[in-house]
Amino acid sequence: MKLEKDRDVLSLKGVSVRYVDSTVALHPTSLDVKQGEFLVLLGASGAGKSTLLRSINGLVLPTKGEVSIPGLAGGVVNAKTLREHRKRCGMVFQQHHLIGRQSVLRNVLMGKLGDRGAFASLWPWSKKDKLEALTVIERVGLLEKALSRADALSGGQQQRVGIARALIQKPRILLADEPVASLDPATAHSVLTLLHEICKKDHLTAIVSLHQVELARSFADRIIGLRQGAVVFEGRAEQLSPDVARNLYAKQSNASNTSASTDSPRTLQSSQTKELLPC
């Protein structure tokens, strides 16, 4: 089903996440995201960006509030709709999560596992699947590397493989958690340019977390600024003033850092966690 332009594809309603010791990882957050929007979550490490992304993807279920997705059974992400939601949602990770000894082609094909039944996963990939994978590999500029081992690639190339793996899912929403944090500035700009161009061409909604202000200004349709687990700015890139940007990175107290210093679900209430697996 093709969604209409400018239609909301995601709504957060008072979503919050608390740790077992009651410190807050994410304060109540409400947000609507449009079809085709390139939304950037901006803030320092520990600001709550990853927690927010994982709440959207269902890797962490909110302590309070709800994530609403039009077209999803019941309209809300919960334990019953989680599998269906993740099939609609592609994920790009900072650390790639590639299988180094496997080829680029096989790593990209892993993005289709959600479409295969338990028994079908035991059989070889079809020619159709492989051609589909080669198509997305070509889109990220790595066709000549399709049969190369993933661990033989540069960091930027590995991230392109991660993008291709997400794209083969044909997602309605693409989430990217600090996708260029470990790359040098030139490579980071190149990878984000690729991601932005693909999303705009496909009218694909993207929510990308970054800590680099200039990259956010260069690529975002809209910026959500987070600090200490709370939204402190929401607006277009040109509305992000130097003072607001500095405030996002102002030194935090030790107590505040504790409340949002890690987004690892291991420290969350057990009823609110989900296994960390790609979409």
UniProtKB/Swiss-Prot annotation:
Biased composition (Low complexity): 253-262
UniProt entry tagged with the keyword Translocase: yes
NCBIfam families assigned: ABC_phnC
Subunit and partners: The complex is composed of two ATP-binding proteins (PhnC), two transmembrane proteins (PhnE) and a solute-binding protein (PhnD).
UniProt-annotated stretches for the region Disordered: 253-279
Localization terms from the record: Cell inner membrane
Protein name: Phosphonates import ATP-binding protein PhnC 2
Residue intervals of the ABC transporter domain: 10-253
SMART domains assigned to the protein according to its UniProt record, in alphabetical order: AAA
Residues where ATP binds: 43-50
Swiss-Prot/TrEMBL catalytic activity: phosphonate(out) + ATP + H2O = phosphonate(in) + ADP + phosphate + H(+)
InterPro entries registered for this protein in UniProt: AAA+_ATPase, ABC_transporter-like_ATP-bd, ABC_transporter-like_CS, ABC_transpr_PhnC, MetN_ABC_transporter-like, P-loop_NTPase
Keywords for the protein's UniProt record, in alphabetical order: ATP-binding, Cell inner membrane, Cell membrane, Membrane, Nucleotide-binding, Phosphonate transport, Translocase, Transport
Membrane topology according to the record: Peripheral membrane protein
Encoding gene, per UniProt annotation: phnC2
Keyword set includes Iron-sulfur: no
Function (record text): Part of the ABC transporter complex PhnCDE involved in phosphonates import. Responsible for energy coupling to the transport system.
Any GO CC annotation of this UniProt entry: plasma membrane
Ranges of compositional bias, category Polar residues: 263-279
Gene Ontology MF term list: ABC-type phosphonate transporter activity; ATP binding; ATP hydrolysis activity
Domain of life: Bacteria
Family annotation (PANTHER family): AMINO ACID IMPORT ATP-BINDING PROTEIN, PHOSPHONATES IMPORT ATP-BINDING PROTEIN PHNC
Cited SUPFAM superfamilies: P-loop containing nucleoside triphosphate hydrolases
Broadest EC class assigned to this enzyme: translocase
Protein family according to the UniProt entry: Belongs to the ABC transporter superfamily. Phosphonates importer (TC 3.A.1.9.1) family.
Enzyme Commission designation: 7.3.2.2
